[in-house]
Amino acid sequence: MTILGLWLVSSDNKVMYTLPIIILMFSDAFAALIGEFYSKYKFNTGFGTKSIEGSAAFFLTTYFICINFFLFFSDIGNINIVLVSLLLSILTMILEVISWNGLDNLFVPFFVYMFLRLNLYLTEKELMYKFWVMVILFVIIILNRKKTTLTRTAQTASLFFLYIIMIMGGIKWLVPPLIMYLGYYHITPKVEGQVKDSLKGLLAIAFTTSIWLALSIVMDKDKLFLIYIFSFSLHFGIINLIRDNAGNINRETFRMKFLMGSIGKALMFFIINHIILSGITDFKMLEGVIVLIFGGIFTYETVMKIYYIVEKEKELSGETKVFITSGIVFFYSLLLLGIGML
């Protein structure tokens, strides 16, 4: 399936077709071999177990393959070869780590193909810019590693997510997820004995927000950017509610003070991002944002209250709550899209 798909999209470009397959054949195989027989430092991704040694083997093999492949089969400059190989090796290593159930066999080669299409013939200056974006995001995540509830694997995935957002949409689209990543720990209530949030939860949030960036390629960019900000704002408000409810003993009762606090933080998140980043003055959509933030947060709280009335002794995991949140956010984002299309 992967080989057929690459053959269909590569349009007889030998580099675009061959390199993804070679990386899949050798990097993935060496990583699996090293991880199986020589690994000492293993970590749980939320979908299974990977090893630091296996990831390092994947990175080094990919880098070696890319350097030599470009030297022999491309006409790009030496500095460009190093930069493209380095960026591609880092990103595919992260993608391999966060893939599950063998889907790296699909994700990695198609990502390599897309990366080559977008980056192979960029100038040295453009590649250096992308490299420094990667370095800066990496430094931010390292400095913030103790001020987050994410597992280390999820933090690594957030680097991949933020980088892709930056490259596809630019700084404008990067700011909302970066503010959320850096701010939620400090602005939302602290939780005693906080269980680390998994990769699965991060992927759910990433999907329900980044889909609007993907759609902006073919639809109204300004309106979709407003929906993009809205989706992060609603996520932020519900996360505030989740963290506040973690210490709530009376789970079956509504607490209007805290509900309004979460709504206020969601609206503040939206207003700050909208004023700084979005110039849209579609008052119909802006009114819809206010109404739908109220509706989304009350919907989440109502779902939780009904659950706790029915299941008095059971507690939902944080991961499950994030899945529910992502579903609610996506639903209300679709409603806002409908308002924008009227």
Describe every region a protein language model picked out.
Residues M1-F30, G35-N44, S51, S55-L342:
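Hydrophobic alpha-helical transmembrane segments
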